[in-house]
């Protein structure tokens, strides 16, 4: 979703093809044999197959809200997200696949990242992770915090991370996020073309 949000914000119009990962279309594998999502094929037929790369590509073309400001200061946070927290999140969500520890063990590992986010938000008066407004790091991070929170929403709601909970709610309820969350049927050859990025200034 973070890649799609950046495309929407930048106003770059792309053809949207929703896929079921358990039934990957041949056209997808031909474009990117890695077989993971998201995938963005550019006009020159080069391929971006990491959401962060898609975000940077789109925002380097058009960045109406200056999300890329202080991007260098966000690198450590994003590395921690992608290399540590996402692994902890995966184990927390799918703990039955990792029976060497109970689910709460993986929750505690992921909670360390929440503590760091809360500290950043306190520093920025609750407005953002890297600035006193929404920037690249907020959009890159919040979809994964959302996933973590909804594994056990009752537990998350009683945590002491008040700034984090408000920040997360604001992003979940934002017009931009809601605009890219609508469900579309899985793509198949011959389908009517759907687009993302038509409205540039959400």
Residue spans of the language-model regions?
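GST-like domain detector, emphasizing the conserved glutathione-binding G-site
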Residues: 1-115, 123-127, 198
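Short, flexible loop/turn segments with low-complexity composition
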Residues: 68-73, 178-188
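Acidic, serine/threonine/proline-rich low-complexity intrinsically disordered regions
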Residues: 100-105, 153-159
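Alpha-helical transmembrane segments in multipass membrane proteins, preferentially the mid-helix core
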Residues: 116-121, 148-151
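Surface-exposed helix-capping loop/turn segments at secondary-structure junctions
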Residues: 119-131, 176-181
């Amino acid at each position: 979703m973070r890649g799609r949000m950046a495309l929407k914000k930048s106003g770059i119009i792309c053809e949207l093809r929703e896929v079921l990962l358990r039934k990957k279309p041949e056209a997808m594998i031909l474009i990117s044999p890695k077989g993971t999502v998201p995938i963005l094929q550019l006009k020159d037929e080069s391929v971006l197959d990491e959401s962060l790369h898609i975000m940077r590509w789109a925002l380097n073309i058009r960045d109406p809200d200056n999300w890329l400001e202080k991007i260098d200061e966000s690198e450590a946070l994003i590395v921690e997200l992608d290399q540590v927290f996402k692994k902890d999140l995966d184990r927390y969500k799918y703990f039955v696949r990792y029976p060497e520890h109970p689910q709460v063990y993986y929750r505690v590992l992921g909670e360390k990242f929440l503590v760091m986010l809360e500290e950043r938000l306190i520093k920025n008066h609750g407005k953002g992770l890297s600035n006193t407004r929404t920037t690249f790091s907020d959009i890159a991070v919040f979809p994964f915090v959302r996933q973590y929170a909804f594994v056990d929403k009752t537990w998350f709601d009683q945590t002491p991370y008040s700034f984090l909970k408000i920040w997360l709610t604001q992003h979940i309820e934002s017009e931009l996020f809601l605009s890219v969350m609508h469900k579309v049927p899985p793509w198949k050859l011959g389908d009517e073309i759907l687009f993302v990025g038509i409205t540039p200034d959400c």
